Amino acid sequence: MNQGHDMYYQQHMSAGPTQQPPTVTSYNPQPPIMQPSHGSYPAPPQPYGGYPYTNGMPSPQGPPVPGQMGPGSVLPSIAGHHGQAPGPVANQYSGFDTSGQIAPPGMKPRVTATLWEDEGSLCFQVEARGVCVARREDNHMINGTKLLNVAGMTRGRRDGILKSEKMRHVVKIGPMHLKGVWIPFERALDFANKEKITELLYPLFVHNISALLYHPANQNRNNQLMAAAERRKAETGGMRNPQGPPGLPALHHHSMSQNGSQSLSGNIGRPSLDRAHTFPTPPTSASSAVNMGSSDSFTWPPHQAMSNGQQNPMSIDTSLSNTRSMPTTPATTPPGSTLQSMQAYPPASQSYDGSRQLYNAPQLQQSPYQPTSTSPQDRSLYNQATYVKSEMGPPSARPMGSVLPGDHQNDQKPVNGLMHPPQGADQGHNNGVEDEADHEHDPEYTHDSRTYDNSQSQYNYTAPPVSSISSEQAHVSTDMPPGGQHGNSGRSTPRSAAAPQAYYQQAYSTSPRSATHQSTSNLYNVMSNDRGSTTNGSANGDVYSQSTDLSNGYATPVTNGNANLKRGRDDDDDRSSSSGQMDLKRRKTLMDNPISSPVYETMNRPAAAIAHPVSRRR
C-alpha cells in the first residue's frame, strides 16, 4: 500500500544510526500499519537502496518533525532527530508526505474559490489532470467522485467505493464540478494517499487553505473574492434565517442602514467595488441595487414605508431581492395605472356584444323572404336542400294555367331536379283533387335559385296570395289561354308568374319539343335576344326568359331517334356536294345491310353527323 514511499528513505544517511520507534521495528518486511487514532501512516521501514538526488543533498533520517509541518501533522516523530532536518529540505521533499500540507518541490499553490449558492457555502477548487476537485469551506467535505476521477479509477470501482462510505452526501443537481458524492476530509485524504495523488491535489488538503488565496501576487483580487464570498454567505444565511443579526446588509457599499454600514466600513480589506463577484448582474430595473437614492421612485409604496420607517437591513435586503427579480415594467408603471388598465376591459367586452349584433343583422336583412315562405309556391323554392338530384320528370297533375311560379314547366318541359313520374301523365290530370295530391311532392325540387345566382331575387315575383291549396283552379288567370294553346313551345308558363328556378339543366332529359325552341342560357338570351316576344306570345317575354333552363349546348335526345336522324340527313345533304360518290357508297352499304334496324340506324347516324362538322372545321 505504501511501497512507493519506501524507496525515498535511503540507507546512506548522513547523520547517525537510524532508530525506529518500537511500534514498527517488528514490521520491517511489511508495509506500515495505519494508526486509527490519526488516520495516517507511521514512518516506513528502509529496506531499499538509496535514491540519488540531483542536488546532492543528504536525505533526512525520517519524516519531518511535526513542529515544522505546522498544526495538524499526524506523523510520529523519530527519537533523537528533532530539528536535524533543515527547513529547505523539509519543504523540498514534503510532497512525499501523506498529509498534503506542504507543497511539492517547485509547485505553486493553485486554488480557486467559488460560491455554491445551493448549499450556501464557499468552495475551494483544485484542478488536477483536468479534473476540478472541490472542498467545502463550512464542513471541509470533499467531492469524492471527482477525487477518484483524478486517480483514473473506473466508474464501477469508484461507485462501489463511494457507496460503501458510511458518511456521504450525494449531490445530483447543480454545477457539473459540484455534483457527485461528498465525503469527509479524512476519508478523502485516505483515498488520495491510497491512489498516490496527494501531491497532485496540493493544496486541497491544506488545513488553512483560505490563506493561500491571499498570495502577494494577487492580493487585491483575492481580497475582493473572499470579501464577496463572505458577504454572499452572510446574505444567503440571512435570507434563510430572517431572525439573523441586523448588522449584515446585503451590499455594504450602499448606505442602506446606519448601524450595519458603519460596523462594516472599518474593514480595511474591503474592495471598492465587488458587486460583480457577488451575484450576477441584475436587470436594468434593479437600479436600486446601484443607487439607493434613486430607487425610492421605483419601489412600491409598502416598500417605501419599510425602507423609510425602519432601519432593519434585512427588510431592505428583501426589497432589494424583489427589485432584482422584477422585470422592467414595474419600474416605470405605477400601481394606479395598472389598476386602471385592468378596469378598461369590461367596455371592451361590451363592444364584442355590439359586434355580435352586427353579425346578427343579416338575419334582419333576410326578413323580406319570410312572408313568401308561407305561400305554397315558395315552399317549393326554399325547402329543397335535403333531396338528391334526380333525372325524372316534372310534377304530373298541375293545371295548365296555374299562376304558381313553380308551375311554368308543368306541361311538357321536364326538369331534371324533380322526383316525379315522367311527362307522360301531364295532360290527363286537371282536376283539383289530383292537383292537391301532387302538391304534397312540390318541396322535392332539388335546386334553389339562391344557390345559383343571388341576382335572381329581383325576379322572385310574389303571386297573388292563395288561400287554399285545393282551390287553385279559382286563381287561374282569365287572360291566359289554356296550356295547350301556347304556340309550339310546349310550355304553360303564365304571363304573370315568377320564375325563381333559373338555371336548371335540360341536358339529357327527354322532351318532344322541337329544336327551334330549345332553351338556351341566360348569357345568350341577353346577348342575342333570340327569344324575343314571339317565344311565348308576349311582349314582355324577355323578362321571364331569364328563368328558363340553362342549356349545356347538347341537343336533347329523343327516345325514337327522329331528331338525330333528321340532323344526320341534313348533314348528309350538305355533304353530298363535296363527297357525292362516298355518300352513295355509304347509303348503298346501309341499304344492303340485311340486319339494319331503326336501332342500328340510330346508332350509325349520329356518328356521321358528329364526324362531319369536325371535317368541315378543317
Curated annotation (Swiss-Prot):
* Pfam families in alphabetical order: KilA-N
Mark out the compositionally biased spans (Basic and acidic residues): 438-451
**Nuclear localization domain: annotated segments:** 566-588
Q: Where in the cell is it found?
A: Nucleus
Upon deletion of the gene, what happens?
Leads to reduced conidiation and mycelial growth. Delays the transfer of conidial glycogen and lipid droplets and decreases efficiency of appressorium-mediated invasion of rice leaves.
InterPro entries found in the cross-reference section: EFG1/Phd1/StuA, HTH_APSES_sf, KilA/APSES_HTH, Tscrpt_reg_HTH_APSES-type
Provenance organism: Pyricularia oryzae (strain 70-15 / ATCC MYA-4617 / FGSC 8958)
Gene for this chain: STU1
Give GO BP annotations, semicolon-separated.
Answer: conidium formation; positive regulation of transcription by RNA polymerase II; sporulation resulting in formation of a cellular spore
Q: What does this protein do?
A: Transcription factor that regulates asexual reproduction. Binds the StuA-response elements (StRE) with the consensus sequence 5'-(A/T)CGCG(T/A)N(A/C)-3' at the promoters of target genes. Required for appressorium-mediated infection of rice leaves due to its involvement in the mobilization of lipids and glycogen.
Ranges where the HTH APSES-type domain occurs: 110-216
Organism domain of life: Eukaryota
Could you tell me which SMART domains the record lists for this protein?
KilA-N
Residues crossing the lipid bilayer are none
Q: Which family does it belong to?
A: Belongs to the EFG1/PHD1/stuA family.
Q: Where is the composition biased (Polar residues)?
A: 13-28, 91-101, 256-266, 284-298, 305-326, 336-355, 452-476, 513-563
Protein name, entry field: Cell pattern formation-associated protein STU1
